[in-house]
């Protein structure tokens, strides 16, 4: 009997990570050294925020995404806290609003100017006071406007209406020990927590009740994290009794045994999982690691499918993840991370290689947009709503090569096209839009014909190479599946 090796088919098998060039990094940022298992970084389509070292209090830096290169030491910061900042989170419904939690026991919400900071920001829009110990966790409600959750080292979870500075719910009896992280579910009707007592809990915040609990989800003593997936399952990252790092997938309807359990390695850095509900891919970053592992979650055993690992030389001190609406879809970018080094932030782009330069519908289903589905009052009254979805097709920008291929302009015409301007010719259409008399400044038709002949030959060559690559990929697929 012969056994054939079956390779699981997945459009994400060949996802690869690539750091940007040095001039696209953010240099000379003094990343916070505070001892706390937070990401220290938050990013949205407009701004990058990084918790930084600050004397006499806590601060974080907010940079427009295009503010790359070396950051001046005098660059203004958000510096209203009197103790170190532990966590920050951008509002999903307003790209200029960010919340922060600090060792000074307060939560502050800030309005960032549209074009970024020109002077230090010391006055928050609102200060939320209710915790008696440091606040280490901040997370906005995914669909209800102005609803913010905070969790502190007093083992208390508070839910606020930021618009009125009102404390909506206080959950102070569900956690006997330090809360490691909090994650809302898809529509914000529930959230899950990972706690120092090794339990994962699913909580209904409006009822103040425990919906489900799994004790000793991971038996190790080091910090673990739990996140909700789009289908209601829970993904956890923690440590075994022998201090090996583990990943697990749970069904809250049956919390007795994990659906899947994978051991990674014996490193001691806390694992930070980032989940993309559109692709069902989980990216796992370890604090102090120099790698990002990524896994696809499916309904088929073994449920957690390893895809690949991005590896670099420098360890990461924190990590931020760009929302899907901030990605470059024309480059088949499915994720972008902002890796914190000791003194810089380095974007890392995750790309699915595709030959076609058309919009890739299968990679970019409709995704959560910036509009809130509910007001805070609606959510408090018991309403739930899924995120309002938007299409990323409008963000698609055809590549220069595609512009060239679809051009139908008569390049041999001596007349200038309507609206022609020498200074306004774009790179994408420069070859086809410039009249023949201006091509080399000489008016020689022979040179123009030579250029056009070269273009036609190049197109034929590209087509032949594409067909050859397709045949090789098909042959390789048959070999992997044992058909040859």
Swiss-Prot record:
Source species of the chain: Rattus norvegicus
GO cellular component annotations of the record: actin filament; cell leading edge; cell periphery; cytoplasm; cytosol; glutamatergic synapse; lamellipodium; perinuclear region of cytoplasm
Free-text function comment from the UniProt entry: Regulates leading edge dynamics and cell motility in fibroblasts. May be involved in cytokinesis and signal transduction.
WD repeat feature ranges: 80-120, 130-170, 174-213, 217-260, 265-305
Protein name as annotated: Coronin-1B
Posttranslational modification: Phosphorylation on Ser-2 regulates the interaction with the Arp2/3 complex and cell motility in fibroblasts. Phosphorylation does not seem to affect subcellular location.
Main localization, broad class: cytoplasm
A GO BP annotation: actin cytoskeleton organization
Family: Belongs to the WD repeat coronin family.
Location of the protein in the cell: Cytoplasm, Cytoskeleton; Cytoplasm, Cytoskeleton, Stress fiber
Coiled coil: 447-481
PANTHER family: CORONIN, CORONIN-1B
Any one GO molecular function term: cytoskeletal protein binding
Stretch forming the signal peptide: none
Assembly: Forms homooligomers, but does not form complexes with the other coronins. Interacts with Arp2/3 complex components, including ACTR2, ARPC1B and ARPC2. Binds actin.
Residue numbers of Phosphoserine PTMs: 2
Keyword hit for Nuclease: no
Cited SUPFAM superfamilies: WD40 repeat-like (SSF50978)
Keyword check for Translocase: no
Gene transcribed to yield this protein: Coro1b
Entry keyword set: Actin-binding, Coiled coil, Cytoplasm, Cytoskeleton, Phosphoprotein, Repeat, WD repeat
Stored PROSITE patterns: WD_REPEATS_1 (PS00678), WD_REPEATS_2 (PS50082), WD_REPEATS_REGION (PS50294)
């Amino acid at each position: 009997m012969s056994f054939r090796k079956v390779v699981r088919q997945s459009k994400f098998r060949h996802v690869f990570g690539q750091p940007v060039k040095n001039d696209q990094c953010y240099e000379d940022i003094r990343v916070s050294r505070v001892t706390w298992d937070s990401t220290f970084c938050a990013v949205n389509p407009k701004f990058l925020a990084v918790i930084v070292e600050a004397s006499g209090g806590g601060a974080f830096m907010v940079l427009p995404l295009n503010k790359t290169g070396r950051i001046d030491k005098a660059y203004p910061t958000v510096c209203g806290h009197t103790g170190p900042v532990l966590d920050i989170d951008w509002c999903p419904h307003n790209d200029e609003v960010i919340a922060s939690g600090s060792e000074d026991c307060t939560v502050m919400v800030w309005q960032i100017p549209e074009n970024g900071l020109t002077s230090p920001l010391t006055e928050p829009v609102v200060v939320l006071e209710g915790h008696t110990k440091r606040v280490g966790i901040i997370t906005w409600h995914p669909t209800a406007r102005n609803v913010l959750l905070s969790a502190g080292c007093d083992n208390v979870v508070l839910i606020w209406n930021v618009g009125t500075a009102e404390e909506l719910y206080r959950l102070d009896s569900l956690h006997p020990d330090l809360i490691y992280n909090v994650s809302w579910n898809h529509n914000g009707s529930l959230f899950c927590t990972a706690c120092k007592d090794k339990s994962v809990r699913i909580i209904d915040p409006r009822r103040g009740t425990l919906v489900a609990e799994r004790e000793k989800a991971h038996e190790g003593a080091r910090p673990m994290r739990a996140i909700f997936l789009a289908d209601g399952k829970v993904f956890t990252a923690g440590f075994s009794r022998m201090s090996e790092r583990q990943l697990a997938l749970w069904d809250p309807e049956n919390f007795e045994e994990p659906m899947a359990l994978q051991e990674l390695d014996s490193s001691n850095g806390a694992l930070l999982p980032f989940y993309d509900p559109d692709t069902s891919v989980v990216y796992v970053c370890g604090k102090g690691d120099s790698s990002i592992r990524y896994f696809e979650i499916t309904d088929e055993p073994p449920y957690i499918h390893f895809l690949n690992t991005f590896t670099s030389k420098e360890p990461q001190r924190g990590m931020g993840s760009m929302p899907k609406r901030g990605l470059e879809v024309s480059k088949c970018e499915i994720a972008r991370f902002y890796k914190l080094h000791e003194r810089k932030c380095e974007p890392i782009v995750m790309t699915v290689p595709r030959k076609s330069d058309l919009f890739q519908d299968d990679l970019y289903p409709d995704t959560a947009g910036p509009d809130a589905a509910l007001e805070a009052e609606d959510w408090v009254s018991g309403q739930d709503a899924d995120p309002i979805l938007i299409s990323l097709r409008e963000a698609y920008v055809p590549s220069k090569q595609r512009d060239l291929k679809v051009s139908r302009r008569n390049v041999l015409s001596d007349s200038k096209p309507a609206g022609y301007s020498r200074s306004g010719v774009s790179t994408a259409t420069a070859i086809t839009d410039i009249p023949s008399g201006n091509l080399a400044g000489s008016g020689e038709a022979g040179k123009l014909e030579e250029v056009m002949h070269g273009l036609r030959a190049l197109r034929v060559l590209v087509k032949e190479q594409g067909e050859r690559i397709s045949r090789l990929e098909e042959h390789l697929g048959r070999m992997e599946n044992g058909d040859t």
